[in-house]
């Protein structure tokens, strides 16, 4: 999975897909009451990027629904995964449950259209810190209460704050989540980061019977040397400001026979068995 990073303006979706991304990440900003308002990162952000691009969240969902719906004029077959970077660290943890309700309802109304949409992308909920785990509980409660629990099959969970892996496991255990879990490891492209935690996450992913990590990706990679390092370690995905660079690295002799771009037929919730 090549995840285009910080794709917050509607016009950026095609831009990143044209560069080779098959997944996009966008930031969701909330008001003080936990209501999702806009797709927006804000300052500071990655080096060399404009931090202020934005869209109204519901309008963004309306557009991305078309882009991921077969037979729609806007359909782009390669886009198979949407990563929602939930900016919950900007609001009180007491509002995390309300935020989960709101995002679930907006996905129901504007993306899935309560069963009337054929939009097919998988959804990855990126939560910054484990302290905001009530977002997940609310999201799942809302799907159940609204009568659309089946959409859980399309939704995965990821904590992105580089927290202790065992601490994350404990929270997932509290929530009763033992599948459809991704793990991210990384830092803004402005800085370098070691591989200790990334290696630990990959080791846990590959441990038989360990059900708290199905996929691991590294972020935000812009240098080809770091992309190569991550691929050698065996990541499932790379988040980048430059998907075209990832494509070029994947075509190199060292990687061409080991990796390929994920398609809709690849289940993002299953561990890869090479």
From Swiss-Prot:
GO terms for biological process: killing of cells of another organism; lipid catabolic process. Disulfide bonds join 45-51, 47-190. GO terms for molecular function: lyase activity; metal ion binding; phosphoric diester hydrolase activity; toxin activity. Its main location: secreted. Its cofactor is Mg(2+). Its EC number is 4.6.1.-. Keywords: Cytolysis, Dermonecrotic toxin, Disulfide bond, Hemolysis, Lipid degradation, Lipid metabolism, Lyase, Magnesium, Metal-binding, Secreted, Toxin. The active site is at 5, 41 (nucleophile). CDD domains: GDPD_like_SMaseD_PLD. Mg(2+) binds at residues 25, 27, 85. Expressed by the venom gland. It catalyses: an N-(acyl)-sphingosylphosphocholine = an N-(acyl)-sphingosyl-1,3-cyclic phosphate + choline; an N-(acyl)-sphingosylphosphoethanolamine = an N-(acyl)-sphingosyl-1,3-cyclic phosphate + ethanolamine; a 1-acyl-sn-glycero-3-phosphocholine = a 1-acyl-sn-glycero-2,3-cyclic phosphate + choline; a 1-acyl-sn-glycero-3-phosphoethanolamine = a 1-acyl-sn-glycero-2,3-cyclic phosphate + ethanolamine. Belongs to the arthropod phospholipase D family. Class II subfamily. This is Dermonecrotic toxin SdSicTox-betaIIB1ai.
């Amino acid at each position: 999975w090549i995840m285009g990073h910080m794709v917050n303006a509607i016009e950026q979706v095609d831009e990143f897909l044209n560069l080779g991304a098959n997944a996009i990440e966008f930031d969701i900003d909330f008001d003080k009451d936990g209501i999702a308002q806009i797709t927006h990162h804000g300052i500071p952000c990655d080096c060399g990027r404009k931090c202020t691009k934005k869209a109204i969240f519901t309008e963004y969902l309306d557009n991305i629904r078309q882009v991921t719906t077969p037979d729609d004029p806007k359909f782009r077959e390669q886009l198979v995964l949407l990563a929602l970077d939930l900016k919950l660290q900007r609001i009180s943890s007491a509002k995390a449950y309300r935020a989960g309700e709101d995002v679930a309802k907006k996905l129901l109304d504007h993306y899935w259209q309560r069963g009337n949409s054929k939009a097919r992308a998988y959804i990855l909920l990126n939560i910054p810190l484990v302290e905001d785990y009530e977002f997940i509980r609310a999201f799942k409660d809302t799907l159940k209460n609204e009568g659309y629990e089946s959409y859980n099959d399309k939704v995965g969970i990821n904590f992105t704050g580089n927290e202790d892996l065992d601490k994350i496991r404990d929270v997932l255990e509290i929530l009763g989540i033992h599948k459809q879990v991704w793990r991210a490891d990384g830092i803004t492209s402005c800085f370098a980061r070691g591989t200790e935690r990334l290696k630990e996450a990959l080791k846990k992913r590959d441990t038989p019977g360990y059900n708290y990590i199905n996929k691991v990706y590294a972020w935000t990679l812009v240098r080809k040397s770091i992309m190569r390092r991550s691929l050698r370690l065996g990541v499932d995905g790379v988040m980048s400001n430059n998907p075209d660079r990832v494509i070029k690295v994947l075509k190199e002799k060292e990687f061409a026979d080991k990796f390929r771009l994920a398609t809709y037929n690849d289940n993002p919730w299953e561990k890869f068995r090479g």
